[in-house]
A protein has these predicted regions:
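Carbohydrate-interacting/catalytic domains
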Residues: 2-5, 9, 13-16, 20-56, ...
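N-terminal structural segment of carbohydrate-active enzymes
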Residues: 25-156, 211, 215-216, 610
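Conserved, mostly hydrophobic/aromatic
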Residues: 55, 92, 102, 131, ...
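The substrate-binding groove and active-site-proximal loops of carbohydrate-active enzymes
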Residues: 70-83, 125-141, 169, 179-193, ...
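Short, acidic/polar
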Residues: 79-91, 189-205, 359-363
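Aromatic- and acidic-residue-enriched segments that line the glycan-binding/catalytic groove
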Residues: 110-127, 164-190, 230, 266-282, ...
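Active-site-proximal helices and loops of the catalytic beta/alpha 8
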Residues: 198-199, 205, 210, 215-326, ...
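Aromatic-rich carbohydrate-binding modules that target alpha-glucans
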Residues: 554-605, 611-639
Length: 674
């Protein structure tokens, strides 16, 4: 059942019950909800349709040879500027996107005697001196104004990058004399709030930008985000511009948070609780990782997943409050490019067909995603960094521009502007344009209710519907061809299915459809005659509790030495520990080579290892996956080889490790306490 429909229905029933009991006024919780600043439904409605193209300004395109930083992180020319973006607007528009996001463009003034590392950091824009001036190495206020106006004339929203939690040490006052308070990283709230409210409003009113991407949004408390959201809404309503259709409109006022973590941390530091929103949209880092782990590998070379891995990640959206609007991306300026991940995993090279097929599969998933999506420049042409694939040592990678957190900041390859694309690149670009155009024409894709039909090692299939627009999205997660038999009753289809790209029709035969799917192929099939799908509402039994001594939560601790000499901890991205060794997550020895710790856990998917405080030894589950109640082999861990533990329910869990007599790892289990 739709979480939002369920909650809405439940709210009505509760309200009716309260009325029947003679409730005389709002409860304390209701007063708190009414006092909070709600997410703007008009902004949310339009934001579903966002197809954003991200530009790293200093590395993108050199449009003015007289300016530029000339240094920075990554392997680019480091001469990118605003004019280069203006020169690329026709190309960007041709992709079928409808928005651009620029990394920070505000002035970062050198401090006398600063070293080359500070010069490189200045080029990123992420530590600004003057939030109210355009960096002269990027351009002028007039150039920025021209960029925004020309983008709007092409039907492109423009989003700036807001760094509201840190700044350069030589930060200068706002036009009204305000300054951020506290240290430079992070600043102090609520004292810094008026300064950043002024920043947020200034650029909307001055240039009529359409909103903000929010860097390290966890640095700003939820209450401050409510105030900044209201400032952005008010500023957006105070000005207008004429769009590409000749309509007079207000700036959109969209804001999207960067919180590089799991669903629970994104809730805690970004979205806020149900009924009391902090922020309304955040990048979907959890699903991004599952996406690359399915079609390539992640930055730590872990991959080989299938459709069920994607389905599990999408199902975890249920953890978010109703106002949450995740924004999915394949990459960004802090992540390794998808093409380089394919090479890191020894999966495919740019000369291989599969390199391009896997790109198309991953990008198709974005096109079928409900909510805003973001493309990083170069995604559309399968870009990669020459002579780079494996991780480079931290001692030398920054000098070479090859650290994982900045290697994707390569020079922009814009056809007809800064590069000439080859046939493979042109083909992928045309495919992306086709996807974006199709997505814009089908509300089922960008706003539809999602029903997963099939998810296994070989394929992922969703049914998407918005009003009478219904589409079946299929994507292969294997290199083998297959024939899919799809039941019409399950799909909610009473007639043909029609391929939205090829026009091919699949007739209904004996209650089902047969759809061929090549390796890593994606298809979008319109349901010509949609009906209510037959959904099995019987709750599937969840196995969360195991059997045997490893599943017992009350085994007594024994006062004797076990086979492991150091104290071990469950260490991971839990909201109560954040990869720190906490006493409440320390294992105790129970005898028989068994170590256990009982903890209170939230529902969700967590990345973790079992380690001593000095990380020697450290252990992980074999296969890097752990399911509740299932005994799994334990093996030696290392950096990046994290166990992904899926806990479908909140509650008390026991974590158990067993070892051989000689101290070698044996098995691991997590089990919900009964």
């Amino acid at each position: 059942m739709n979480k939002k429909i369920y909650r809405s229905t439940l709210s009505i029933l509760i309200a009716a019950a309260l009325a029947g009991c003679g409730s005389s006024g709002p409860s304390a919780d209701e007063k708190q909800a009414s006092a909070s600043y709600a997410c703007n439904p008009s902004v949310a409605e339009k934001s579903h349709q966002l197809r954003i193209y991200q530009v790293m300004v200093e590395s993108f395109v050199d449009g003015d040879p007289n300016i530029g930083h000339g240094t920075g992180y990554g392997t680019s020319h480091h001469q990118g500027d605003l004019q280069g973006i203006i020169d690329s607007l026709d190309y960007i528009q041709s992709l079928g996107v409808n928005a651009i996001w620029l990394t920070p463009v505000f002035a970062s003034v050198p401090i006398t005697g600063q070293d080359h590392w500070a010069d490189r950091l200045d080029a990123t824009g992420y530590y600004a001196t003057d939030y109210f001036s355009i960096d002269p190495k990027f351009g002028t206020l007039e150039t920025a104004k021209a960029l925004v106006e020309q983008a709007h004339a092409r039907g492109l929203y423009v989003f700036f990058d807001g760094v509201f939690g840190h700044h350069k040490d030589n930060v200068v006052p706002s036009p009204t004399g305000k300054l951020p308070a506290g240290s430079s990283n992070p600043v102090s709230y609520p004292e810094s709030l008026p300064f950043y409210q002024e920043v947020a409003a200034y650029w909307i009113k001055t240039l009529k930008i359409d909103g903000w991407r929010l860097d390290q949004a966890y640095q700003v408390p939820l209450e401050a985000w409510q105030d900044i959201r209201q400032t952005v809404d008010d500023a957006s309503q105070s000005v207008t511009y004429v769009n590409h259709l000749g309509e007079t409109v207000h700036p959109l006022g969209y804001m999207v948070a960067e919180i590089w973590n799991n669903e629970n941390v994104i809730n805690q530091t970004g979205y806020g609780p149900q009924g009391t929103p902090g922020l309304c949209s955040a990048f979907d880092f959890p699903v991004r990782y599952r996406l690359v782990e399915t079609f390539a590998v992640n930055e730590n070379s872990n991959g080989g997943k299938g459709g069920s891995w994607l389905a599990e990640g999408m199902d975890l959206h249920r953890l978010y409050p109703d106002h949450a609007q995740p924004n999915l991306m394949l990459g960004n300026h802090d992540l390794v490019r998808f093409g380089d991940l394919l090479q890191r995993g020894n999966i495919a090279e740019p000369t291989d067909d599969q390199y391009w097929q896997r790109h198309k599969a991953a990008l198709s998933f974005l096109a079928a995603y409900t909510g805003p999506i973001t493309l990083y420049y170069g995604d559309e042409i399968g870009d990669q960094v020459e002579h780079f694939a494996d991780k480079v040592s931290g001692d030398i990678c920054a000098i070479q521009g090859l650290c994982d957190d900045h290697v994707a900041r390569s020079s922009g390859k814009i056809d007809g502007v800064s590069a000439t694309l080859n046939a493979r690149q042109r083909d992928l670009k045309a495919y992306v344009t086709e996807l974006m155009t199709m997505r814009s024409a089908h509300p089922a894709l960008y706003q539809g209710e999602r029903l997963n039909i099939v998810a296994n090692d070989k394929v992922y299939v969703d049914r998407k519907q918005q009003d009478q627009d219904a589409v079946v999205y299929l994507v292969s997660t294997t290199d083998a061809s297959q024939q899919l038999a799809l039941e019409a009753e399950t799909l909610g289809s009473a007639g043909d299915l029609m391929d939205l790209q090829s026009g091919e029709r699949f007739p209904l035969s004996s209650g089902h459809y047969t759809v061929p799917l090549n390796g890593f192929e994606a298809r979008f099939l319109r349901i010509v005659s949609p009906v209510q799908p037959a959904v099995d509402l019987t709750a599937k039994a969840l196995t969360v509790t195991g059997t045997g001594i490893m599943a017992k939560c009350d085994n007594p601790t024994v006062n004797e030495q076990g086979p492991v000499s150091k104290s071990l901890y469950v260490v991971g991205d839990f909201t109560d520990s954040g990869w720190k060794h906490k006493d409440n997550r320390q294992f105790a020895y129970k005898g028989q080579n068994l170590y256990q710790v009982v903890t209170n856990e939230q529902a969700g998917s967590f990345r973790l290892q079992y380690a001593s405080k000095d990380w020697s030894p450290q252990y992980t589950a074999e296969g890097l996956e752990l399911r509740p109640g299932q005994k799994t082999p334990l093996t030696a861990g290392s950096y990046g080889k994290d166990t992904a533990a899926m806990l479908p329910e909140a509650g008390r869990y026991v974590w158990s490790l067993t070892f051989q007599d000689n101290g070698l790892p044996d098995a691991v289990m997590v089990s919900k306490c009964e």
